[in-house]
Structures are given as structure tokens and as C-alpha cells.
Design a protein with these regions (language model features):
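Transition-metal
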Residues: 1-209, 279-299, 323
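Short, conserved beta-strand element in jelly-roll/cupin
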Residues: 38-40, 87-91, 98, 133-141, ...
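A short beta-strand-loop-beta hairpin characteristic of the jelly-roll/cupin
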Residues: 48-49, 58, 63-74, 147-148, ...
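Short acidic-glycine-tyrosine-enriched beta hairpin
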Residues: 88, 236-249, 253-258, 263, ...
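Generic C-terminus detector
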Residues: 92, 349-391
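A short hydrophobic beta-strand segment most commonly corresponding to one strand
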Residues: 94, 134-144, 260-279, 321, ...
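C-terminal, non-catalytic macromolecule-binding modules
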Residues: 261-313
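Conserved short histidine dyad/triad with adjacent acidic residue
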Residues: 307-309, 319-337
Length: 391
């Protein structure tokens, strides 16, 4: 049981104030602090302090003793800590993304390797052979887009902009998955005069349309005034998560984080296919091949937790990670698992005890627990988030 020393990622879309206001993390340079990373990702591993006072990378510590740190099942299955845990602070919209499924990730990675595409090339889609399932848990009101709306909903929303592009009129005639695929690709392929004309029709509609998703389009247009991704809120569900609500992001499903602070848990992968709201490379044929053009009602997007005493367990449909929340104010609790775990203090104060060892976590602080350690006794006043594996 060791306290983690974590790193902050400074991406342009990040908030300059959220991590300071929530967790007292200093920002003397006033940089955008987008993400606090907890884990053993090779790009930026957390660090731990050993018994002799030396600070080492968590990734290196795990590498030296995988079975003890990860548990036999996780070590055999993944060979590394299979998840990355983050605090994500979005002050402005992130790009619309799609994550390929596991099989397509393996095929795409092998294909790009065989083609000799450098790992850091702009046109590289697959950085590894893994899928990238994600869970987002809102700490503040959190605005996002996730999955295609029901076709009847898309039809009614597209009516005011029917003249923007022929593919819109085409979809309105026969609203099905095939024509949604054509519409999605056509909007992304727009260039020059065609794109200017379409965006002019959309922006004119903003003058007469009220409420959502038009308000979200207005917000996004402040940052991406000339991006064809401005049509996306008409096609995708706009989701407002309240603090404490969570949502799982499936493979082959377009999504975007727009504003707010959340905990995010994800598999260890950097495979992203972009689909708008970005100046970066968009591989449209590869993107379309990796998207399921099927509707998902907004009411089905939230992940409902299962309550057991003071624990809320959020069901995850993959083995790469599990996520639960522990309310220490309700009762003292014993936390144990057959895998590694990262515990994060969401609010209040958590006191962790194991044998003679005592560790206090304040809001924003986290600890790593190895698979071979006995259960930890957790008490205090706040809430503790736990990421681990159920293998």
C-alpha cells in the first residue's frame, strides 16, 4: 500500500483552474491542466516511494514482480496493469472519437506495421493492438456526446438544415443505417464551397432554433467555427451527466467530451479514430469501417450502479477494469481484491490501514495496492473510488 505520485498532462483543451479548485493542485504557470494520470502507462507512469525512500516508476516496480503486484490472472492475461485511471478536466470540447474493437485493433496495428508507417506519423491510426473501452464518472456537471440518436429524432432535428447538403435530404427520404453511414462520411468529406455553404445553413438555423442540441452547437462553434463536426449534435445524443452519474463508452461508437470534470477509466490503449472537432488527421474510410451505425436511445446510456452496503459497483462489460465507489461516511469498510487496485479520494478524507501501516488520503490523492496484499481497512468521512480487476 503506497501513495502514488501522479503526473498532470497539459493539453490545450484542459482547465486552468479545475484541479486547483477541486484538489489543491498548484498551477503557477497557469497552464491548461487537462488530465491527472494514475497508473503505469509507458507515456507517463505514476511513481511510488520504496521502503528505503527511493522514488521509482510504478511501471518498473510492476515489471519486476508482475504476479505479486497484478495477481496471477491479470499478469497472465494482460502482462501489465491493464487500465489507466484519470481525472479529466475539459474546459472546451475534445475531438469526436471512435475506438476500434479488439479484433480490428489487432488487424489495423499489424497492417500499419507491415506498411512501415512510423508510430508518430500523423496518418497512423493504430498505436497498439488493444481496444479502448472507457467509463466516465462525473465529478461536476459533465457535457458529452455519445452514440447515434434514434433515427426519428435525427430526422426531426435535420429538418431545419435539410438544404445544407444533398446527403441530408437523401437520409430524410429513407432514414436507415446505410444512409446514415453515407451522411456521416459526406459531412466529414466536405471541403471548400460545399462546406462553407453547409455550415452557413446550419448557422442560420441557430438563429431560429432554441434548446438542445442547438445550444451545444453554439458552444462548440465558439471553438470550431469551421468544422463539419458542428453537425454532430444533430446525429449524436447530447448527454448531461450530473455529479455521481456514469456512462460506459463502447467500441465503434462516436463520442466526445465537451465540458466538465470527471473520473475516467480506460484500457491501456492509444487507438483513436477521429471524427471531427479537430485539426488532426481524419482517416474517413477507416473511421466509417469501424463505426456501428445503429441508434442507442439516450435513456440507455447511463451505467446504473449496484448498491451493496456502502459500496456502489458500476457494471463494466469488459475485463480490462472494474470501478466502484465507497462511501466511508456510511461505514468503515474492508477493501480487498485479487488484482492490483488504485484508490482515489474523491472528497473528504480516507484513512487506510493495513497491519501496522496507516495511510491518509486527502481529496485528489491516490494509493496503489498490490494483488498480494491483505484487504485494506478504509475509514473516514469522504468517498473513495476504486479501480481494479475482477478476473
Amino acid at each position: 500500500m503506497q501513495k502514488l505520485i501522479n503526473s498532470v498532462q497539459n493539453y490545450a483543451w484542459g482547465s486552468k483552474t479545475a484541479l486547483t479548485e477541486l484538489y489543491g493542485i498548484a498551477n503557477p504557470q497557469q497552464q491548461p491542466m487537462a488530465e491527472l494520470w494514475m497508473g503505469a502507462h509507458p507515456k507517463s507512469s505514476s511513481r511510488i516511494t520504496t521502503a528505503n525512500g527511493e522514488t521509482v516508476s510504478l511501471r518498473d516496480a510492476i515489471e519486476k514482480n508482475k504476479t505479486a503486484m497484478l495477481g496471477e490472472a491479470v499478469a497472465n492475461r494482460f502482462g501489465e496493469l491493464p487500465f489507466l485511471f484519470k481525472v479529466l478536466c475539459a474546459a472546451q470540447p475534445l475531438s469526436i472519437q471512435v475506438h476500434p474493437n479488439k479484433r480490428n485493433s489487432e488487424i489495423g496495428f499489424a497492417k500499419e506495421n507491415a506498411a512501415g508507417i512510423p508510430m508518430d506519423a500523423a496518418e497512423r491510426n493504430y498505436k497498439d493492438p488493444n481496444h479502448k473501452p472507457e467509463l466516465v464518472f462525473a465529478l461536476t456537471p459533465f457535457l458529452a456526446m455519445n452514440a447515434f440518436r434514434e433515427f426519428s429524432d435525427i430526422v426531426s432535428l435535420l429538418q431545419p438544415v435539410a438544404g445544407a447538403h444533398s446527403a441530408i435530404a437523401h437520409f430524410l427520404q429513407v432514414p436507415n443505417a446505410e444512409r446514415l453511414s453515407q451522411l456521416f462520411a459526406s459531412l466529414l468529406n466536405m471541403q471548400g464551397e460545399e462546406k462553407s455553404r453547409a455550415l452557413a445553413v446550419l448557422k442560420a438555423a441557430l438563429n431560429s432554433q432554441q434548446g438542445e442540441p442547438w445550444q451545444t452547437i453554439r458552444v462548440i462553434s465558439e471553438y470550431y467555427p469551421d468544422d463539419s463536426g458542428l453537425f454532430s449534435p444533430l446525429l449524436l445524443n447530447v448527454v448531461k451527466l450530473n455529479p455521481g452519474e456514469a456512462m460506459f463508452l463502447f467500441a465503434e461508437t462516436p463520442h466526445a467530451y465537451l465540458q466538465g470534470v470527471a473520473l475516467e477509466v480506460m484500457a491501456n490503449s492509444d487507438n483513436v479514430l477521429r471524427a471531427g472537432l479537430t485539426p488532426k488527421y481524419i482517416d474517413i474510410p477507416e473511421l466509417v469501417a469501424n463505426v456501428k451505425f445503429e441508434p442507442k436511445p439516450a435513456g440507455e446510456l447511463l451505467t446504473a450502479p449496484v448498491k451493496s452496503g456502502a459500496e456502489l459497483d458500476f457494471p463494466i462489460p469488459v475485463d480490462d477494469f472494474a470501478f466502484s465507489l465507497h462511501d466511508l461516511a456510511l461505514q468503515e469498510t474492508s477493501i480487498g481484491q485479487h488484482s492490483a487496485a488504485i484508490l482515489f479520494c474523491v472528497e473528504g478524507e480516507a484513512v487506510l490501514r493495513k497491519d501496522e501501516q496507516r495511510l491518509v488520503l486527502k481529496p485528489g490523492e491516490s494509493a496503489f495496492i498490490g494483488a498480494d496484499e491483505p484487504p485494506v481497512n478504509a475509514s473516514g468521512t469522504g468517498r473513495l473510488a476504486r479501480v481494479y480487476n475482477k478476473l
